[in-house]
Amino acid sequence: MLFDYRKGGLFLGTISEKIFSRAAGTEAKANDFVLADVDYAMAHDGTSVLAVNAFKEMEMEKVWDPSRIVVPFDHIAPANNETSATLQREIREWVKEQGIPNFYEVGEGICHQVLPENGFALPGKLVVGADSHSCTYGAFGAFATGVGATDMAEIFATGKLWFKVPESFRMTVEGSLRKGVYAKDLTLYLIGKTGIAGATYKAVEFYGQAIRELTVAGRMTLCNMAIEMGAKTGIVPPDEKTFEFLKNRAAATYEPVYADPDAVYLEEFTYDADDIEPQVACPHQVDNVKPVGEVEGTHVDQVFIGTCTNGRLEDLEVAAAVLKGKQVAVRTIVIPASRTTLLAAIENGTMETLLKAGVTLATPGCGPCLGAHQGVLGEGEVCVSTANRNFKGRMGKGGFIYLASPATAAASALTGEITDPRTV
């Protein structure tokens, strides 16, 4: 329980308020500014370069705690040119100089998969990453958010950062998702309802039967895209599924945090899972969401299954179930979110099914999601992607990106056009 440090009384708050109260060592309510202790800090190959440069400009010699800094190489991994290779070499040297043990080389996977797999995403913790989708870790009951390189340099140096405690939304999804409807569909549906700026700088807490029934992987998909509605973070209260996932992998002890019954929310929303069918986010905004039936038949040049949103084992299994015994009609790129995911998919036969269906397998990492390599689009080409963003130019300046679930992506790969997965 957290107490009101000014009055000595019981402090009733949201999950975010409680986590910041613990991290700041004082009562922290929505809209307060606090200097908080960061539990874990992450910067990948794309952002660590800027953060390290800023750290050096501060004339700092040693990071505050090497054991609480995580550096995965995932965005341009393997390096796509000499410039990237040189920058990555410099970061490797810095990591070695600083004695940072939590360094994950090319091929180990995407930061937002690697951190949970290695037990850094923990209930009640304040986890900060130099990447906007760091909100993924809220799936484990952490307050997790992204910051810029200068802020990350400050964390590297001191382990602390100023925050404005966000106001909170409470989103409840009652009922169960129907067959053929997945966490990605639920996520896109909520973004469509909220809008890309509808939750700006809010912490969104997710509740309801549909949320409780999501797997850990499904919750990661949901919280990963909280930023796409403008949120500072998305949080699922931890439960037995969370604790089971963390068993034998948690990097530290942790104390789960839950909102109190009298916690104050800026707004509360309730949705019915039965209203949700397969969803597609159409170009060029993530909130341009439509039921798959409204865009069914749209020509597709490429399908991409992977990313920090939907590159986990269960995502690959869903795609494999759709493709089993069949052949893709268009080029289809599959990139597991991590080496661990890839090995598991090999061991249970999922990867064999996908490869026999004609997909192209690439190194675990971000792949073409950010438009750097491994499947960027040509002028006028259309891609159905399981990623989290479809902005103009995201995967190539002339491309068109439709965001969908692994099931919808796989079904579209079979037909060469956007297809309802329930029909194949």
UniProtKB/Swiss-Prot annotation:
Reactions it catalyzes: (2R)-homocitrate = (2R,3S)-homoisocitrate; (2R)-homocitrate = cis-homoaconitate + H2O; (2R,3S)-homoisocitrate = cis-homoaconitate + H2O; cis-(homo)2aconitate + H2O = (2R,3S)-iso(homo)2citrate
Q: In which pathway does it act?
A: Organic acid metabolism; 2-oxosuberate biosynthesis
What processes does the entry annotate via GO biological process terms?
Answer: L-leucine biosynthetic process
Q: Domain of life, per the record?
A: Archaea
PANTHER family named among the record's database cross-references: HOMOACONITASE, MITOCHONDRIAL (PTHR43822:SF2), HOMOACONITASE, MITOCHONDRIAL-RELATED (PTHR43822)
- Subunit structure, as described in the record: Heterotetramer of 2 HacA and 2 HacB proteins.
- State the HAMAP family in the record: LeuC_type2
Protein name (record) = Probable methanogen homoaconitase large subunit
Question: What species is this protein from?
Answer: Methanosarcina acetivorans (strain ATCC 35395 / DSM 2834 / JCM 12185 / C2A)
**What is the primary gene name for this protein?**
hacA
